[in-house]
């Protein structure tokens, strides 16, 4: 119990520190200090305040970017040969057995779609990512987990297709309709505290080349890391998708 409590306290301190560093004292006050009244638990109130503080910060600071994409519409896929993207940074030979099994299952059920395994050695062949982001990954300022969020948006923006996390096991042929949607993800009928509310899943995401969501998220990530050195929240990708769903009609239609 003591170890769990200490972990929770440390995580809470990290959350507040990151919000303070990126979004300032006002959002820390709203998130962690402002008193609350009513029947909701302190935990629920804190979670909701944290989510609202992060959304407010992002929507305020990236308002011009949001406006840029407000009227853009999704473009239907132009090819039935859309690629499939998966990443294992160290390469296939370094995959642990469970990841190898997942990768083989993906290749076996890809149909006519070419599976591209992105690694540290071949990434520059497929996608262009700013040097300042790659440098911050090397410096440890950007975790590899978050870098993979950036990577999937960049790949889908440049090439379109379907991103699947390396730890997803595919048990049957991927339906062609997945590749025919301008924006594809999966939803789950579950209760969750995540800002996504299980309306989308980042581990599987499909898009047309230069699709609205991936274009918006890619550009926001680029602008964010050009000036920041800390990740505002572990689930930043979900906050970005939430903002897109709220403000961009084409994304909202696809995720409804």
Could you tell me what each predicted segment is?
Residues 159, 164-166:
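Active-site acidic Asp-centered loop
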Residues 149-159:
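Small-residue hinge/turn detector
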Residues 1-148, 166-256:
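Glycosyltransferase-associated regions of secretory-pathway enzymes
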């Amino acid at each position: 119990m003591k170890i769990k409590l200490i972990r929770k306290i440390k995580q809470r301190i990290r959350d507040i520190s990151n919000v303070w560093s990126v979004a300032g004292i006002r959002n820390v006050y709203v998130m962690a200090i402002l008193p609350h009244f009513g029947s909701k638990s302190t935990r629920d109130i804190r979670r909701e305040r944290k989510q609202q503080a992060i959304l407010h910060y992002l929507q305020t600071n990236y308002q011009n970017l949001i406006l840029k994409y407000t009227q853009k519409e999704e473009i239907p896929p132009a090819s039935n040969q859309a690629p499939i993207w998966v990443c294992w940074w160290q390469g296939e030979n370094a995959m642990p057995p469970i990841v190898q099994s997942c990768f083989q299952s993906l290749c076996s059920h890809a149909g006519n779609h070419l599976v591209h395994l992105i690694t540290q050695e071949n990434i520059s062949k497929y996608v262009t990512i700013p040097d300042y982001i790659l440098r911050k990954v090397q410096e440890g300022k950007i975790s590899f987990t978050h870098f993979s969020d950036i990577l999937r948006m960049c790949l889908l923006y440049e090439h379109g297709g379907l991103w699947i996390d390396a730890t997803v096991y595919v048990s049957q042929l991927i339906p062609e309709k997945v590749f025919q949607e301008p924006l594809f993800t999966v939803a789950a009928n579950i209760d969750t505290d995540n800002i996504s509310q299980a309306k989308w899943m980042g581990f599987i995401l499909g898009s047309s080349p230069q699709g609205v969501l991936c274009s918006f998220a890619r550009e926001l990530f680029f602008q964010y890391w050009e000036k920041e050195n800390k990740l505002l929240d572990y689930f930043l990708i979900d906050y970005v998708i939430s903002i897109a769903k709220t403000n961009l009609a084409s994304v909202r239609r696809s995720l409804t």
